[in-house]
């Protein structure tokens, strides 16, 4: 199972770095920061499906 540490989030601004992650919502997030901010917003219901595009 792929895991990612989001303990340092949310962050007010994310970089434009492109390292796609696929969330359990079948949405592709452009990088860890965008994904982790979404995890925080989801109250932990969003998890990482896999690294790379969905």
UniProtKB/Swiss-Prot annotation:
Q: Which InterPro entries does the entry mention? A: Bifunctional_prot_inhibitor, Kazal_dom, Kazal_dom_sf, Prot_inh_Kazal-m
Location of this chain's protein in the cell: Secreted
One GO cellular-component annotation of the UniProt record comes to: extracellular region
Q: What is this protein called?
A: Ovomucoid
* Domain (Kazal-like) ranges: 4-54
Free-text note regarding domains: Avian ovomucoid consists of three homologous, tandem Kazal family inhibitory domains.
Q: Which organism is it from?
A: Spheniscus humboldti (Humboldt penguin)
Q: Which GO terms describe its molecular function?
A: serine-type endopeptidase inhibitor activity
Q: Which UniProt keywords apply?
A: Disulfide bond, Glycoprotein, Protease inhibitor, Repeat, Secreted, Serine protease inhibitor
Organism taxonomic ancestry? Eukaryota, Metazoa, Chordata, Craniata, Vertebrata
């Amino acid at each position: 199972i792929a895991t990612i540490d989001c303990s340092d989030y949310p962050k007010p601004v994310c970089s434009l770095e492109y390292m796609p992650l696929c969330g359990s919502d079948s949405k592709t997030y452009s990088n860890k920061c965008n994904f982790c901010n979404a995890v925080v917003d989801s109250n932990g219901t969003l998890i990482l499906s896999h690294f790379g595009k969905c």
